[in-house]
Amino acid sequence: MRLGVNVDHVATVRQARRTFEPSPVCAALIAQQAGADQITLHLREDRRHIQDRDLELIKELVNIPVNLEMAPTEEMREIALRVRPDRITLVPERREEITTEGGLDVVSMKERLKEYLKPLKEAGIEISLFIEPDKEQIEASRDVGADAIEIHTGRYQPLERHRFEEAREELRRIREAAIYARERGLRVYAGHGLTYHNVKEFVRELKDVVEELNIGHSIVANAVIFGFERAVKEMI
């Protein structure tokens, strides 16, 4: 199973002070050196963390695939066509949300997305849609021309609250959805809310049907804690 490392929250720390550090570009290069298979970043409309220049530099400097998460807006499509990431993942976006709260409703946007995606497909960019593990959404994703889906795994988090039955049921839902999507010619990825605490069981149960995980916040959080001693010693 491949790992896509999301560097958004390196930029979140930087933007808290509107300064130049820490750099998500440096983080992307370190992730690549550490063995990541892909760099994922979300250029939001409000630019709350990743900035346009981050995307441009990461695409220019890393030698592994770049996955651009973006809302289905005209502005973002223009940026994607200019920068040419290896993949775009369409996600829903609300300015008031802290993070992406759920999957894209492809069913209700079906006709619009068919037209929206045409130039991106013609440019040779892989198209992935971030959706719930739902058969209707999978069918719609195939119909609009997606190459892949990324299943929203946020509801798998009850494992961390010791609600094991709920977590097992969510794994079952994700497995069924992944199999259904693969049978219809879609590649299957997954992400959101995966941590060091719950990812091992996820991989063990789904490695035969899910090709790739995209993980960011948990990696950044661990880096802050486990790199803190070294950083303090270097300052002293």
UniProtKB/Swiss-Prot annotation:
Family: Belongs to the PNP synthase family.
Biological function: Catalyzes the complicated ring closure reaction between the two acyclic compounds 1-deoxy-D-xylulose-5-phosphate (DXP) and 3-amino-2-oxopropyl phosphate (1-amino-acetone-3-phosphate or AAP) to form pyridoxine 5'-phosphate (PNP) and inorganic phosphate.
Catalytic reaction equation(s): 3-amino-2-oxopropyl phosphate + 1-deoxy-D-xylulose 5-phosphate = pyridoxine 5'-phosphate + phosphate + 2 H2O + H(+)
Principal location: cytoplasm
A GO term from the CC aspect: cytosol
Keywords recorded for this protein, A-Z: Cytoplasm, Pyridoxine biosynthesis, Transferase
Marked site (Transition state stabilizer) residue numbers: E150
InterPro entries in the record: Aldolase_TIM (IPR013785), PyrdxlP_synth_PdxJ (IPR004569), Pyridoxine-5'_phos_synth (IPR036130)
Location within or outside the cell: Cytoplasm
Binding residues for 3-amino-2-oxopropyl phosphate: N6, R17, G193, G216, H217
Residues reported in the UniProt entry to bind 1-deoxy-D-xylulose 5-phosphate: D8, H9, R44, H49, T99
UniProt EC number: 2.6.99.2
Name under which the protein is recorded: Pyridoxine 5'-phosphate synthase
Active site positions, chain numbering: H42, E69, H192
Pathway(s) where this gene product acts: Cofactor biosynthesis; pyridoxine 5'-phosphate biosynthesis; pyridoxine 5'-phosphate from D-erythrose 4-phosphate: step 5/5
Domain of life: Bacteria
GO molecular function list: pyridoxine 5'-phosphate synthase activity
Subunit structure: Homooctamer; tetramer of dimers.
Broad enzyme group: transferase
GO terms classed as biological process: pyridoxine biosynthetic process
